[in-house]
Amino acid sequence: VTSTTITLGESGWFKIATVVMPQATSTAVIKLYGGAGFNAGSPEQAAISELVLRAGNGSPVGITATLWRRSPAAANEVAWVNTSGDTYDIYINIGQYAYWLIAQYDYTGNANVTLHSTPEYSSVQPGNSTSGQTYTIYSSLMKPTAGDVGALPITGGQLNGPLSIGTDNALGGNSIVLGDNDTGFKQNGDGILDTYANNQHTVRVAPGEMMVLGA
């Protein structure tokens, strides 16, 4: 592992490295310590950003680039430009004031990484670049929202499909079962709410009427 320092002053895109990534295959990693901003009492600025680059199998020719971010002040996006053959320029997007970051990098014996201590800057993503994939590593600092994990927020939301409490749901449709998979409530049409006990239709509530069935 090799360490150096880089400074990324503005908010935008920076060409932080040029890599040689032979096909079938090779791997390179770049890790940045520190993030956008340097304010005392702002622990999120002591950020970690990790780039993992992996060459393909030659069909098609190319690389995969992933950015793993651990803080809101870490790098935001990654992209690359294939300049020739197996050579690629690697770009990241990061916020302002990313000064004096520690950069560590490593690569397999058939690859090479040249890190740029004073990277070229662009306010926008290079037009001929390919976007990589960004993943957020959730922690006590970066907690997922309900939407991030496919949950409903405490303020409410829409559940698509049947709901069951303590069991599976045999009623299907827009229904709620409780404890027994065929005992509960089901919406069976516009304004129609049915009650089931052991899959027996017992009560129907509709506009202007309520019917007790099977009594």
Give, region by region, the residue ranges found by the protein language model:
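Surface-exposed ligand/attachment interfaces on beta-rich extracellular proteins
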Residues: V1-A46, P72-W80, I154-G156
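Residue-level detector of short, conserved catalytic/binding motifs and their immediate flanks
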Residues: A28-I30, Y88, T183, L193
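Fibrous stalk/shaft segments of extracellular and virion attachment machinery
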Residues: V1, Q133-L178, D182-A215
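Short, flexible beta-strand-to-coil junctions
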Residues: L8, K31-E44, V52-G56, T83-D86, ...
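A signal for long, low-complexity, Ser/Thr/Asn-enriched, surface-exposed stalk/shaft
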Residues: S71-A74, T83, T87-A151, I192
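Short, solvent-exposed coil/turn segments at beta-strand boundaries
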Residues: A24-T27, S84-T87, L159, P207-E209
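Short, surface-exposed beta-strand/loop "edge" segments at domain boundaries and coil↔beta transitions
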Residues: G37-E44, I92-D106, N169-L171, D182-G184, ...
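Terminal beta-strand-rich extracellular "head" domains
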Residues: L53-S71
